[in-house]
Design a protein with these regions (language model features):
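Rossmann-fold NAD(P) dinucleotide-binding segment
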Residues: 51-63, 67-115
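NAD(P)+-binding Rossmann beta1-loop-alpha1 motif at the extreme N-terminus of oxidoreductases
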Residues: 1-64, 125
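Hydrophobic beta-strand scaffold residues
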Residues: 27, 47, 115-117, 158, ...
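Rossmann-fold dinucleotide-binding core
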Residues: 4, 96-175
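Helical "substrate-binding/catalytic lid" subdomain
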Residues: 166-255, 261-276
């Protein structure tokens, strides 16, 4: 049975600890913020004095810190995980960071015979508490098999994306899609406002009339064989409607840089499809 440690018990870390408690797992934890440690103590966790001390008493360490610098420091720095970890310890990096950072940490860990997997989280604390967290994971199939039972105590689904670092890439592109939708909707309602449409009415219309994420029908938009990532142009959308809305924004004198870039991207896709 794995002995579980956790570095970083902020909002996400505490939510993960709640799930682990429900599964009967008592973790040893460390954080630089004392009030968070007291909340972890209230959940029945043991408190360590450093990341190294967590690793000394663990076979599996969840790393739930915020930035690339934080990950490097708490794993490879003084009093970090690698200073205390025994051979065959598995470090699961849950932070949203660059894949190159994951690979840098993995390279440092190899000298200590410590394994590293990026197991990035797709959700917020309420998602975790509701048991709906998903993990996108990069690492070998053997390490995935070891990590998955632990991950499923904290979430509902694990997606293996490929080798080390691909979990981090997957998290970033997933958030890229989510964030870009918000930004383009903002530009769309600016165009609607300029055309006399109150934005709540525009948003309600777009929600009710045929708005469907491309992800729900990606096999119709992209080649499902995986051989060609070029999207199909779509009847009248990329070759007519997107250019028209770009013209409309110019007529209104609006600064909509994402829409303008979409117009250029649509033209390239239409041309590429014509040349196939």
């Amino acid at each position: 049975m794995e002995q579980v440690g956790m570095i970083g018990v902020g909002a996400m870390g505490l939510a993960l600890l709640e799930r682990l408690k429900l599964a009967g797992v008592q973790a040893i934890v460390y954080d630089t913020y004392a009030p968070s440690l007291e909340q972890a103590r209230a959940l029945g966790c043991r408190i360590a004095s450093s990341a190294a001390d967590v690793a000394r008493e663990s076979t599996l360490v969840d790393v739930v810190v915020r930035t690339d610098v934080d990950v490097i420091q708490c794993v490879t720095g003084p009093d970090g995980v690698l200073e205390g970890a025994k051979p065959d310890t598995l470090a699961l990096i849950h932070s949203s960071i660059l894949p190159q950072t994951v690979q840098q940490v993995e390279a440092a860990a190899q000298s200590k015979s410590v394994f590293v997997v990026d197991a990035c989280m797709t959700g917020v604390p309420d998602t975790v508490r509701g048991g709906n967290l998903c993990f996108v994971v990069g690492g070998t199939k053997e390490l995935l098999a070891r990590a998955e039972p632990h991950l499923l105590k904290m979430g509902k689904q694990v997606f293996h994306m490929g080798p080390t670092g691909t979990g981090a890439v997957a998290k970033l592109i997933k958030n890229m899609v989510s964030g870009s939708e918000t930004l383009i909707v903002y530009e769309a309602i600016q165009i609607g406002l300029a055309g006399g449409i109150p934005y709540p009415k525009a948003l309600e219309m777009m929600r009710e009339i045929g708005h469907d994420s491309v992800l729900n029908r990606w096999q119709r938009t992209f080649d499902p064989s995986g051989e060609n990532p070029l999207p199909k142009s779509g009847r009248n959308v990329m070759n007519k409607d997107i250019p028209l809305v770009c013209d409309l924004a110019k007529l209104y004198g609006l600064d909509v840089p994402i829409t303008e870039q979409l117009g250029r991207a649509a033209a390239r896709i239409v041309k590429a499809n014509e040349e196939r």
